[in-house]
Curated annotation (Swiss-Prot):
<keyword id="KW-0548">Nucleotidyltransferase</keyword>
<dbReference type="InterPro" id="IPR042107">
    <property type="entry name" value="DNA-dir_RNA_pol_bsu_ext_1_sf"/>
</dbReference>
<protein>
    <recommendedName>
        <fullName>DNA-directed RNA polymerase subunit beta</fullName>
        <ecNumber>2.7.7.6</ecNumber>
    </recommendedName>
</protein>
<dbReference type="GO" id="GO:0003677">
    <property type="term" value="F:DNA binding"/>
</dbReference>
<dbReference type="GO" id="GO:0006351">
    <property type="term" value="P:DNA-templated transcription"/>
</dbReference>
<comment type="subunit">
    <text>In plastids the minimal PEP RNA polymerase catalytic core is composed of four subunits: alpha, beta, beta', and beta''. When a (nuclear-encoded) sigma factor is associated with the core the holoenzyme is formed, which can initiate transcription.</text>
</comment>
<dbReference type="Pfam" id="PF04561">
    <property type="entry name" value="RNA_pol_Rpb2_2"/>
</dbReference>
<dbReference type="GO" id="GO:0000428">
    <property type="term" value="C:DNA-directed RNA polymerase complex"/>
</dbReference>
<comment type="function">
    <text>DNA-dependent RNA polymerase catalyzes the transcription of DNA into RNA using the four ribonucleoside triphosphates as substrates.</text>
</comment>
<dbReference type="InterPro" id="IPR007645">
    <property type="entry name" value="RNA_pol_Rpb2_3"/>
</dbReference>
<dbReference type="GO" id="GO:0005739">
    <property type="term" value="C:mitochondrion"/>
</dbReference>
<dbReference type="InterPro" id="IPR015712">
    <property type="entry name" value="DNA-dir_RNA_pol_su2"/>
</dbReference>
<dbReference type="InterPro" id="IPR007641">
    <property type="entry name" value="RNA_pol_Rpb2_7"/>
</dbReference>
<dbReference type="InterPro" id="IPR037033">
    <property type="entry name" value="DNA-dir_RNAP_su2_hyb_sf"/>
</dbReference>
<keyword id="KW-0804">Transcription</keyword>
<dbReference type="GO" id="GO:0032549">
    <property type="term" value="F:ribonucleoside binding"/>
</dbReference>
<dbReference type="Pfam" id="PF00562">
    <property type="entry name" value="RNA_pol_Rpb2_6"/>
</dbReference>
Amino acid sequence: MLRDGKNEGMSTIPGFNQIQFEGFCRFIDQGLTEELYKFPKIEDTDQEIEFQLFVETYQLVEPLIKERDAVYESLTYSSELYVSAGLIWKTGRDMQEQTIFFGNIPLMNSLGTSIVNGIYRIVINQVLQSPGIYYRSELDHNGISVYTGTIISDWGGRSELEIDRKARIWARVSRKQKISILVLSSAMGSNLREILENVCYPEIFLSFLTDKEKKKIGSKENAILEFYQQFACVGGDPVFSESLCKELQKKFFQQRCELGRIGRRNMNRRLNLDISQNNTFLLPRDILAAADHLIGMKFGMGTLDDMNHLKNKRIRSVADLLQDQFGLALVRLENVVRGTICGALRHKLIPTPQNLVTSTPLTTTYESFFGLHPLSQVLDRTNPLTQIVHGRKLSYLGPGGLTGRTASFRIRDIHPSHYGRICPIDTSEGINVGLIGSLAIHARIGRWGSLESPFYEISERSKGARMLYLSPGKDEYYMVAAGNSLALNQGIQEEQVVPARYRQEFLTIAWEQVHLRSIFSFQYFSIGASLIPFIEHNDANRALMSSNMQRQAVPLSRSEKCIVGTGLERQAAIDSGALAIAEHEGKIIYTDTDKILLSGNGNTLSIPLVIYQRSNKNTCMHQKPQVQRGKCIKKGQILAHGAATVGGELALGKNVLVAYMPWEGYNFEDAVLISERLVYEDIYTSFHIRKYEIKTHVTSQGPERVTNEIPHLEAHLLRNLDKNGIVMLGSWVETGDILVGKLTPQMVKESSYAPEDRLLRAILGIQVSTSKETCLKLPIGGRGRVIDVRWIQKRGGSSYNPEMIRVYISQKREIKVGDKVAGRHGNKGIISKILPRQDMPYLQDGRPVDMVFNPLGVPPRMNVGQIFECSLGLAGGLLDRHYRIAPFDERYEQEASRKLVFSELYEAGKQTANPWVFEPEYPGKSRIFDGRTGDPFEQPVIIGKPYILKLIHQVDDKIHGRSSGHYALVTQQPLRGRAKQGGQRVGEMEVWALEGFGVAHILQEMLTYKSDHIRARQEVLGTTIIGGTIPNPQDAPESFRLLVRELRSLALELNHFFVSEKNFQINRKEA
């Protein structure tokens, strides 16, 4: 929370999860009621019985289970919905009223997420084109401007109005078909006289009114038939009927003419209409007014619309998505109730409201939505920052939106209306760049689905601060002072001339002309970009990489908060939910690793802590108590720190001593040289938890059994199993060990037994095992300590809900060669070598550096902010200070960042009596020495303490080797991929490279022994064991045989022949 003395309320940053909470609360408070009111009264075919809902008395019950239990048992954290319903007999005027169970609605927890089947899921906000009308101009093949007006419905359907060279207006209802606007207006219910009375240019409409057109619009029925014929592309003469009208209503009017409340508001504002907001359908009056504006465009009146402007977009929030799904569930329930009433009367049964309603439609609709909808995603829980940022994403993709392959560059680009609403930096990389953005820290969603940004109003009459939230279209009418002018300090005399924005242009104006100013210098950035210190000195592409890489940082076993930050670290940690915070004041009466007992107001509150919990990225989420027994605490005080948090602040990495210099080529191309101190002192050690699970089913031959008596397996592999056949807690397991012993029964014929088995059965009566071993084994690359075993029993004894056993294994990973590290300025690299600390370059006080970066990685990438952070971090480490600097500090004075860094370095050198910290000849640099020889390097080197992160891309998850494994059935070549223990493909270009070097024997091995020559690869193993020479393959490999078979399928016979060396006879041999 950032405050200014005068304007405390204005300077408070809103909660980062607020957008999710507000959306869900709006759904519970308004969306449920709106959809329930739409539920119709249902009558039977004889209209004797009527079913209706009494919406005023619906209630949501408190969940029966806790969040932790839902995660543990793979259940949904939901609330039961109960609604009063009545059944009315019209003949006797009797009514039976009951409170019925409608189904379960998943609830949102304190993190802004939902727990569905034990998995944390989050709903992403979607950016859609706002319903309404938009005017555009395009050039035809002759270079002449063609003006069109596009009407977009609430469903996303589009209809176009266009005007040709002869000033005739057409309505295009499909890509190929277009009809006269007179026909469309007549089909919607207007006659010719009403049309001419409601337009501004009746003479233009009369100019293309031919006798043929008059016949088409002579009556409403003729207009509907003409419209249907053009819309449905139907030949002949269709006959007017009720079914034809219903088809038009369903296919055209419902999908393309329903504007909704937002569309009606936009249509009224764009066309200057005064139609009621409750009238949400497209009217003939709208069509005629749109045609008038289109004619005005043709003659140079009016302005065209920018489709990419945020005022023409709307946010489809969590509330809208959940409300749409609830409405869909009610439609399904309506069909069920209608069918049940008819069925009950047909069988002469007396229905009750309880019997008519089933909870299946609502429950299954939400389960399928959270599990299958593209905007419902599994919560990324790599670190606390990732959890917050994921809920603040804005996606142009999804149902009704764009696709990554068809979106143009203009849509992906930054727009001036994004200022203060969508971060211009934080977006995904790759095919979805510009299509998935992030919400700015101060932005909020308005009433009409628009993104609003706060501004500080400058008023001469009142000296008090007043903050305005403006939608995208409104701030263009004000002179808005840019972010480099002072926004907080009211006592400083303002500059006479300031840069400002006005109508998407940047101007330089006098201070007296400014209407609005920014709240903060980083109010237009997302959370990820706002955590980058000195971001103003970086190229935007590198800042984008940094925003993404901070979300990939692994929580370390010993976290450390950054020396140089921006001030948002504390709020990011608090809003992430990683910390345990006191909800009431009181006294600590007990602390333990798994809970804290707080006594206050006569009650004792138990606060559970997270103990070694696995995230979906296999990182470790853990909380450590920070309070002692007997201490009195206040509301809001931190009780326990979580993963990647220290002192209530976000702590994703470590402050390490870094030198920017080349070292024997080991930091070539962004490689990083590190000291062994980072390994032995567990500086970058992290814990990772993997989950392995197995289910027990009931087969046709009988149930599967979990047991520790597994035949034909070595006792060494079963050493960790308990008497139930499940691995014991605390066991150390290696690759190939049995985690859960399981036997599956199978049908075995008498003839398939081995002779010795049949002999044992005949003589001794010993039953031979007929079960197949289907144990859960630890796969390749897995090793560690078993920290948890969960045996989830099936509920209700149903065979369709099998038992599930989950084993959680913790793995300790030190930093090693091949791991990826990164700074906060897009400077990333791979560990290339780990040097002994005595060989690392050392400073003038004898301290060896921890990392060596390549200095050539800074100038071409233009991320100079890392140099400022590096030098300021060195000063902070020597002075034991932490700096929190807001970006764009040059608004105070020129070269403010450089002056701050140099002054702190000078003070650090003065207080610690180390003059080498700041040397005026080369400030920020220092003479350092080679650890191998003790000689100083030729040039002074930049040294410092930047904040370096260890990323999730680790070599243990990627390194792979294959000696033997599975082969594809058709080609007999090794499979592909690490998960399948696959091989590496030697393709066409690799063969060319080997041919170019003339390595014939290596090439033959690659194409035969190591690939798809079945007999040759079987002989290799034996000859390798006995030390013999590998025999040359005598026949063709399997890939050549496959080619021959494919040619035979095309009726082409291919054979090869051998010519005898003795008599030169040709011997034919089958391929």
